[in-house]
């Protein structure tokens, strides 16, 4: 009840529950902005600016998963760096998150206890209502009581009341089934919608919650929302989209569904309106709350909004403070870890003209598959072979692919550091295994070779233009790359012979598996290891649409680290990845025959048989001469016999 109120109390008080939210940040963590493009990353320092700029501090700061895994900054500390920032970056930090499918990459126990990396007394909660683990309990929800005050502007009297809000989290059970078995050993997933509905009911009936918000990492947010009962809003992750729609839930009531892109490019602010019915009295015992989720308001903020706010010196000060006191110390730790020596390389693995990457972007699409000397295969997709070899070693798959756009560096002979590996694979992409037929795989490789062939023609024209005195940029502007040039595939698990004189669909002369030496069978189904990006590119590679996802693994960078850390990794990689050679797709005509030996001068030899034998060589003259000689010998022998008989 209120003890400070005097004056005219309204029958209904309008208010909002505000939730600032993120999803799928994938280890992105600090602010950046490109004014020319109008794009950038909000980061935790930019988030602090957005948070502080609100007229009233948001009631909740929530995240919908795929948070602790992706960028090397996150993976090298197994998510601890991100967990620390979530907890301490500004104010009280995040209230809660829910696991995304990639967050399990460090194992279920490490994920469940991720909040243990907190340096505060009130860490964020890790919510997964539908997960059950043998080694510990997953939290299903959190509850927060919001103290509200209504003020009478005329009398300056106030009326105090409370709104109870529950937050429940879960991950789509179908995502759990795609995870590596060893990472989720002892953990099972029940129906996410069922678990959320049960917890929402408990929160309302047992805890007296007026508002229930769900955070969930789910395959399809709108389909998922339609299954929810007793939930006012769904803050979703996984689809990497900007979403703001009403969906009718299983209880017939609107569920506001929101999602804020990915990679910290966006931050959402959801306002859920309610009406607090005072019943016209100062007592609160019989007061009721009505929530109008369908009338919710969603605002989406980007790095540009942060940039605009930085015109205020106070906001710039907040950004600088978070960066210097929270982010920089972790950056320093990351830099030190990047200098760790993982192993040593006896050879250069070229990314372009050299291991350093001179013309790497150009060469990995072109002459890596078309050396100037057809007999020189020393540069043929060497860094691509290392990458594919690491995928094969990690997963045990039959085949592997990596697109040119995903490769950003090579390996020079000598010590290989963690930083070198990050430079090769900087995007935080993950390794996945899929199943597809040999025919679909070969079709994709053939189209990749066509893209490479077209890129090679562009590159030759560009180089000629540069030789004529123009800049490389002018050359690329005049002789442009194909838009899909980054889709050229490096591949592993097969020994391949390519005939560049043939057209698309006919260039692969032979392909044998490194596993067992058998020919790649178009009718057989194989397991293919790939990064999670290129396998979804069904525009350039339509046959990928026929593939079936099998298992998710760790980051591409982690696969490289694991391979290079092994003794004798280069020979292992070579045996797994296979070779590329160049030959002819045409079969030579029947070779010229070896001349037949002279027939024996045996009385049992017949002219008919000898003539046929010689004629088969194609030398009719020789056959005729042979027949005459043998005929003459027969005549002489008969003459001798006749004389003796005489």
Regions found by a protein language model. Name each.
Residues 5-302, 378, 383-386, 551-555:
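Acidic, metal/ion-coordinating pockets
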Residues 21-35, 345-349, 353-374, 427, ...:
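Acidic/histidine-rich, surface-exposed loop or edge segments in extracytoplasmic proteins
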Residues 2-13, 612-623, 642-644:
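Sec-dependent signal peptide cleavage junction
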Residues 582-620:
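C-terminal low-complexity, Ser/Thr- and acidic/Pro-rich disordered "stalk" regions positioned immediately N-terminal
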Residues 628-646:
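C-terminal membrane-anchoring or membrane-association module
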Residues 154-162, 274-416, 564-588:
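A short C-terminal boundary segment appended to hydrolase-like catalytic domains
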Residues 13-18, 28-34, 42, 121-130, ...:
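Feature captures C-terminal
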Residues 37-40, 101, 182-190, 260-261, ...:
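Hydrophobic alpha-helical scaffolding
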């Amino acid at each position: 009840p209120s003890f400070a109120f005097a004056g005219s109390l309204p029958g209904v008080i309008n208010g909002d529950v505000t939730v600032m939210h993120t999803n799928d940040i994938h280890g992105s963590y600090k602010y950046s902005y490109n004014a020319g493009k109008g794009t950038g990353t909000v980061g935790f320092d930019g988030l602090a600016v957005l948070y502080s700029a609100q007229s009233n501090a948001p009631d909740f700061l929530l995240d919908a998963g795929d948070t602790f895994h992706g960028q090397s900054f996150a993976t090298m500390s197994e998510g601890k760096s991100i967990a620390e920032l979530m907890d301490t970056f500004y104010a009280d930090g995040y209230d809660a998150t829910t696991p995304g499918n990639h967050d399990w990459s460090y194992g279920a126990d490490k994920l469940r206890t991720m909040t243990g990396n907190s340096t505060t007394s009130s860490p964020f909660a890790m919510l997964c209502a539908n997960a059950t683990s043998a080694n510990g309990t997953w939290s299903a929800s959190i509850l927060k009581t919001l103290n509200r005050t209504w003020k009478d502007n005329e009398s300056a009297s106030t009326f105090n009341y409370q709104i109870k809000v529950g937050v429940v989290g879960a991950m789509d059970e179908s995502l759990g089934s795609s995870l590596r078995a060893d990472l989720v050993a002892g953990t099972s997933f029940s129906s996410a919608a069922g678990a959320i509905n049960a917890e929402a009911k408990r929160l309302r009936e047992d805890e007296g919650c007026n508002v229930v918000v769900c955070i969930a990492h789910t395959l399809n947010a709108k389909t998922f929302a339609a299954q929810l009962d007793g939930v006012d809003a769904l803050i979703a992750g996984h689809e990497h989209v900007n979403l703001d729609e009403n969906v009718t839930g299983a209880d017939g009531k609107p569920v506001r569904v929101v999602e804020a892109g990915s990679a910290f490019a966006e931050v959402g602010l959801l306002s859920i309106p309610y009406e607090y019915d005072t019943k016209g009295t100062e007592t609160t015992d019989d007061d009721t709350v009505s929530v109008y989720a369908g009338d919710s308001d969603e605002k989406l903020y980007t790095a540009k909004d942060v940039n605009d706010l930085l015109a205020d010196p106070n906001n710039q000060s907040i950004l600088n403070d978070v960066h210097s006191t929270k982010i920089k110390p972790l950056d320093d730790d990351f830099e030190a870890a990047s200098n760790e020596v993982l192993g040593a390389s006896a050879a250069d693995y070229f990314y372009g003209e050299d291991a350093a990457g001179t013309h790497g972007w150009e060469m990995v699409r072109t002459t890596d598959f078309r050396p100037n000397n057809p007999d020189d295969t020393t540069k043929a997709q060497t860094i691509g072979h290392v990458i594919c070899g690491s995928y094969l070693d990690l997963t045990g798959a039959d085949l592997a692919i990596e697109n040119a756009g995903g490769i950003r560096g090579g390996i020079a002979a000598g010590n290989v550091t963690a930083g070198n590996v990050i430079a090769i694979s900087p995007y935080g992409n993950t390794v996945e295994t899929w199943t597809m037929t040999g025919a679909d795989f070969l079709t994709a490789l053939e189209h990749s070779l066509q893209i490479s062939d077209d890129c090679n023609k562009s590159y030759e024209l560009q180089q000629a233009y540069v030789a004529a005195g123009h800049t490389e940029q002018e050359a690329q502007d005049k002789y442009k790359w194909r838009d899909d040039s980054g889709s050229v595939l490096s591949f592993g698990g097969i020994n391949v012979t390519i005939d560049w004189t043939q057209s698309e669909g006919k260039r692969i002369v032979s392909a044998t598996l490194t596993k067992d030496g058998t020919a790649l069978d178009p009718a057989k189904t194989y397991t293919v290891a790939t990064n999670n990006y290129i396998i979804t590119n069904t525009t350039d590679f339509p046959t990928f649409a026929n593939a079936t996802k099998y298992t998710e693994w760790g980051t591409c960078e982690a696969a490289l680290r694991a391979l290079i850390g092994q003794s004798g990794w280069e020979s292992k990689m070579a045996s797994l990845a296979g070779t590329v050679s160049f030959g002819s797709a045409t079969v030579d005509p029947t070779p010229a025959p070896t001349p037949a030996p002279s027939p024996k001068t045996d009385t049992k030899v017949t002219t008919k048989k000898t003539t046929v034998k010689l004629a088969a060589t194609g030398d009719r003259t020789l056959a005729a001469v042979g027949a005459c000689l043998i005929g003459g010998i027969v005549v002489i022998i008969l003459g001798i016999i006749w004389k003796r008989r005489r």
